[in-house]
Amino acid sequence: GNYEVSEEGIKLNFQLSGIFEYRTILENNDLYISFLSPKEMYDRIIVIDPACGGSNTGYEADGLLEKSINLQIAKMLKEKLDKTDIKAYYTRIDDVNPEEEDRVRLANETKADMYIRIQVNSHEDTSVYGLLAVYNGSYFIPGFGSVELADVLEREVATSVKGRALGLSEAQAQDY
C-alpha cells in the first residue's frame, strides 16, 4: 500500500486480494486497522444484482430501457436496506455492465446468504403484465429459503407498486 498527505489529512491506500471490511481503533494516537471477511463482520449478507447495464440496454419499450428500470429498483432497495442491519453488496450502482462471472464472484466471495437478481422482461402478449419471481430450487435454507424469499419479495413489491403478482417460477439451467 501507500499513502497520500493532503490538507484534509492522510489517505491510506491498500491493495487487497478479495473483498474485505474493516474496523479501526484509535488508541494513544496510534491507528489500528483490522481487515475482516464480510462474514466475520456481518450476520446477514445479500447481493443485489440489477441486470443489464452499460451498452446492454436490455428490453426497450416506449423509451424505457430495462437497464434503467433495473438500476432504479436496486437504488430504491438500497435506500431501504441501508436502514437495516443487513449488509448488502451491489453488482452495480451505476450504468455499467459487469461480466456475469464478476456478478457471481461477488456473491461467492462475500459468502452471501441471498443473491437477488433484478430483471425486467417483456412478453409477446401485451395483456401479460406483472411480477414474476424466479427462484433457485436447488438452494435451501431451513426455515426460510429461496422459495419463501421469492414469495415475500414478489408480494411486497406487487403491493408497493400496486401491481399484479404472476406467481413463482423455479429457475431453469439456462437462467443461470
Where are the model-predicted features located?
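Signal-peptide-cleaved, periplasmic/extracellular N-terminal interaction regions immediately downstream
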Residues: G1-I46
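Flexible glycine-/small-residue-rich
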Residues: L16, F35-S37, P50-C52, I118-V120, ...
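Short beta-strands and strand-coil junctions in structured, solvent-facing domains, enriched
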Residues: I19-R23, S55, H123
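Catalytic-core environment of secreted peptidases
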Residues: K39-L64, I116
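Active-site-proximal helix/loop segments of hydrolytic enzymes
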Residues: L64-Y176
